Amino acid sequence: MANNTTSALHPRGSGQRCVYDTVLRFGDPDARRRGFQLDEVSHNKLCDIFDSGPLHFAFGDLKVMKVAGGVVTPHKTVVKTVYVSGVQEGNDYVTFAFTPGPNEWREVDPRIDKRTALVGVLVQEHKKLDSDLKESRRELSQLKLEHSLLRHDYERLVREKPGPAMRTFKFSAVIFYAFFLGFLLMSAVKGEVYGRCLDSELNLNGNPEVCLHWEEVKSFSLQVALADFWNMTLDYYATVAPQSPLMDLALGYFPYFANWHMAAFLVGTAHVVAAERPLYMLVTLVLATLSRFQLVALAAVPMLDMPSSIGLWVTMVLFAIDQAFAILASVLISVLLLILCLAMNDVDYGALLRGCVTLVSATVFSHLVSFLHAPGWFTIIAILIYRIPKVLSYVSAERVDIKGPDGKIKETQNANPSWITKMSGLKNFFQRAFRQKVRTGVNPTTRIIPNSLVVIDAKDGRGTGFRVRNYLVTAGHVVGADTTVRVRWADVTSFAHVVYRVPNKDIVLLTLPAEYNSLHSYKLAKEVVDGTVVVVSNGDGGALSVGISEGVIVGESMTYAINTADGMSGSPLTTTDGRLIGVHQQNTGFTGGAVIFRDTDFPQPKKPQREADLEAKVAELEKALAAYTQSATGEDIVGLVRVAIQREMEVLRKELSNEFGQAKGKTKHKRRIMAAARSGGKRKPGKVWTEEEYKKLLEEGFTRDQLREMAEAAREADDDFDDYEEEKNEVDYPVWSDHDSDEEIDRDWFGQNLPTWSSAWSDFEPELDPDVTKTLPCHLEDKFSLKHYIITEADLKHFGQEMKEYMDHLDAVIKTHTEKGKWCPNTNTEEILKDLNAMWFKLNHTMWKNGVAPFMQRKKQKPKNGKRAPKGAQ
């Protein structure tokens, strides 16, 4: 029999049992044994139906058509057969029953067995992952082989690669460069001498016909004056300075640095050697030499765009012919360019306007230089006077941000290039070695969930989505009016339908495709508060883009400053621990905003009308029943009696107080003090924070000792406030309340006689607080100030001087040693608190000694706003 149960189940058609089915053996053992026996005579085998996974065997009834004498009758016969259930490939749960007659397994309505379904799905998933793993390994092996071959080819090509070849120059560039050099030499050897004629024979116009005798003069008086000053300076230096051949050589060649021909030669040669298209600069240098623009043209080049550069070329050609007409032509060309280029955007049009102004200014300045015969150094000084103030702001800056027309920063350049340090690889060495930063706070860590975002493709654009519960959430403007959008997660693409649009919010909920069941689901934040927020979106190349900023709540939105990008709409806005706050919406290039997503924004299930009517009826009946059962139980009656007795006792005590002027009796606060004395002065402290608040404070950076001090200070503030709340309703007599024990009743009614006045007054003698070192700086005024007590004229008459000295000392301590509710650095807090406590005790003891109730025995006045200081304040 054992041999008959080894029929094929895994792999398909192999004749081997699946190991999971062999071990688990779900179902009826007898049905399992009978099923394998029937499988031997069946035309289709179980191994062909179920490729893997456990099977569930069970007996069941099956209705088959009755066949008599080869004729099918309309009556059905119920036979007992075997049902086999399992999970097929594709995670489909099916059930097959053995049908006698045809002797085959036929599919019937599934009979669900949870264990078989769960294990079967896991087996199918394991099989799929195992297949994917094998395929990935094959691909990895193939890629490694291809990489090895490519590496071999690369090494071979590197060995065969020739060395760096000398750069080849274009023939046109070489010819034009030679022409440029010849033009420079021709212009340099041109001799022009200015002089004054000495002949006395004049023609009819008053000018000499032929000048045989003349003397050289210089038309620029400033040049003569500066030359004389320079020569005098050199002569004086030569007489007092030590002789240096290098100094003489430098001073001899210094004038050549202000020569145009030398500057043009250096600039032209540099462009021919290094520039890809040197002809543009060579043309500019030739025209500048021809027209005598010279250094003015070279200084104007950085501020010219393409239209104004062409205008400069035309103007220089005209300047060589007629300077006055060239000035007029520069103005006309500038006006024409400004009119023809009105269709440009603001940025390009601004650059054109700057180029036109530079063109006209360069033409006018060149005319003045030519008219005055100014030397080259004069032009250089004038250009430096213009350029240096313009770039002073750039020189003092550490970096320069280059922005585009949309306001976004396109590029950031370092204003301190430090080329030698950069090329030496020593960047920021000394800063890293010697600069130490002081930690000013604790930066929170951020929890980022990888592979948790999907890409939403709609007709109106593209955005980001994420999963919350069994929905995909994104921004409403991403989906637009579409009802179906395409969703892409990693390499899986599917379609999702719009399920719900949140009213008054730009949020849309989509269906979750079956392929995305393993997508991580975000959890909602427990509370939405101002603080650090995190925006996670899909970046370029499939990487995650994470932005961290400080968020501020504005209504049902949260705004924050972050550098957003296109396609971020619909991204999740989370807390630092990954809890969802809202859905990212806005994109202005710098600021961002999100709509807060709450639990109430999910679609609420609609209740059937019958259920709603029943709930309303039940509520109505409960309301009516409450009226009938009012004060029907013994507890209710006892409560009513207690309230009535309490009311009568209050009236009686008020009457006794008004009639006899009896002083205050024992208050609840006094009773609590007496109880504490009987119990040894120990009082079990109550909890100030919940466990969740305590952990949150620890995460924010507070130590356990600091939290302990904060808790004790908060308990002291609670005790003071409770005393005020208990005493504020007393009218010359304490409010009646039940006694806590029989011992307290015996002590109040049958105790010892009342003490004498002297012994009673001695009981109220102030005591020095032994430990005040735990008092926080923000509680100094509340603990030691006299502003919270009622001070009578008699108090001022007898103790005014002591009170003034005490308050002046307290104000001086608060102003000198505290700042914004915190101790100032290097402050000896223990000595200050002991000093204040000693002065407080001295003042109260003086009042008690003179028969006046000290402030320790008086109650504080309630603050105007009726609120206490927050717990745990520092």
Curated annotation (Swiss-Prot):
Comp. bias intervals (Basic residues): 857-874
Active-site residue list: 477 (charge relay system), 506 (charge relay system), 569 (charge relay system)
Entry keyword set: Covalent protein-RNA linkage, Host membrane, Hydrolase, Membrane, Phosphoprotein, Protease, Serine protease, Transmembrane, Transmembrane helix, Viral RNA replication
E.C. designation(s): 3.4.21.-
Keyword flag Transmembrane helix: yes
Gene3D superfamilies found in the cross-reference section: Trypsin-like serine proteases
Pfam family of the protein (one): Astro_1A
Top-rank taxon: Viruses
Enzyme class per UniProt: hydrolase
InterPro entries recorded: Astro_1A, Peptidase_S1_PA, Peptidase_S1_PA_chymotrypsin
Transmembrane segments: 249-269, 279-299, 324-344, 365-385
Keyword Transmembrane helix: yes
GO biological process: proteolysis; viral translational frameshifting
Catalysed reactions, semicolon-separated: RNA(n) + a ribonucleoside 5'-triphosphate = RNA(n+1) + diphosphate
One GO MF term attached to the UniProt entry: serine-type peptidase activity
Modified how: Cleaved by the viral and host proteases. The protease is probably autocatalytically cleaved.
Chain residue ranges for the region called Disordered: 855-874
Site, as annotated: Cleavage: 195-196, 436-437, 662-663, 665-666, 752-753
A GO term from the CC aspect: host cell membrane
Modified residues (O-(5'-phospho-RNA)-tyrosine): 694
Family: Belongs to the astroviridae polyprotein 1A family.
Protein name: Non-structural polyprotein 1A
Name of the gene this protein is made from: ORF1
